[in-house]
Amino acid sequence: MDKTILGSIDIETLIRHLMIIIFGLVGLTGNAIVFWLLGFHLHRNAFLVYILNLALADFFYLLCHIINSIMFLLKVPSPNIILDHCFYTIMIVLYITGLSMLSAISTERCLSVLCPIWYRCHRPEHTSTAMCAVIWVMSLLISILNGYFCNFSSPKYVNNSVCQASDIFIRTYPIFLFVLLCLSTLALLARLFSGAGKRKFTRLFVTIMLAILVFLLCGLPLGFFWFLSPWIEDRFIVLDYRLFFASVVLTVVNSCANPIIYFFVGSFRHRLKQQTLKMFLQRALQDTPETPENMVEMSRSKAEP
């Protein structure tokens, strides 16, 4: 029997929820800073619009998990099951939105490298803003329809064909986004490392690659769990429980990691003295190879308000 603390909460469950709260608070702070700087202090280009929306999705995703863990540890009862389903639906929306934003960033970066002339001359000006709006609407629509047909409907309608179709779609959609993310990333890497198109890496490229790598390690397991859960839960009940909560903790780590990546890439090979968070973020999202001239220009920007 597992050792318990705080009444009936076992040590493993306590540690898991404490990890979610600790990582979540770090991520909340980091994503709030990123959103504040990108929203009010930096000029936004095509990629920064996606990163701004990614920070917003990560912020609210972490906030939902922190609230859920605190309520669990304090044993605060939920008012009713409808609110539980709504809360769960919101977290699905935010998870799918984050994955969609990352896939859009990778795809747009791939297009900017593979088709540079078209990208600079013929790409509509507000494509990034429009794509972000589409992503939010799609994520909301998919999650709300699934919640309506499978959770909010009368029990006698829960197992109907519409619910099953919706359930299959929401399980396979993250896998589709994962395939799109991988294909665009592989195409980008192939072009950058090929002899004809070989070019210097920018800090923005490094930032995107690190964010994708962290997502593949920490964010994607939950998507695979959703996809495989119909086969897992019927055969391995204990394994199903442990895999689910392990994947949830990993998604919290993933949402917490992006601001750390930005400030790590932005501060790499630069002295921390007299540097601001704005300068770190601006440097991490810089899309031009570093030269002595633009390094001097970046150092001068610290004098700006």
Curated annotation (Swiss-Prot):
Major site of localization recorded for this protein: membrane
SUPFAM superfamilies hit by this protein: Family A G protein-coupled receptor-like
Known function: Orphan receptor. May be a receptor for RFamide-family neuropeptides such as NPFF and NPAF, which are analgesic in vivo. May regulate nociceptor function and/or development, including the sensation or modulation of pain.
A Pfam family this chain is assigned to: 7tm_1
Highest taxon, organism lineage: Eukaryota
Membrane-related topology note: Multi-pass membrane protein
Gene Ontology MF, one: G protein-coupled receptor activity
InterPro entries xref list: GPCR_Rhodpsn (IPR000276), GPCR_Rhodpsn_7TM (IPR017452), MRGPCRA (IPR026233), MRGPCRFAMILY (IPR026234)
Tissues and organs where the protein is expressed, per its UniProt entry: Expressed in a subset of sensory neurons that includes nociceptors. Expressed in the subclass of non-peptidergic sensory neurons that are IB4(+) and VR1(-).
Glycosylation sites: 151, 159
Organism: Mus musculus
Protein's recorded name: Mas-related G-protein coupled receptor member A8
Acetylation recorded as keyword: no
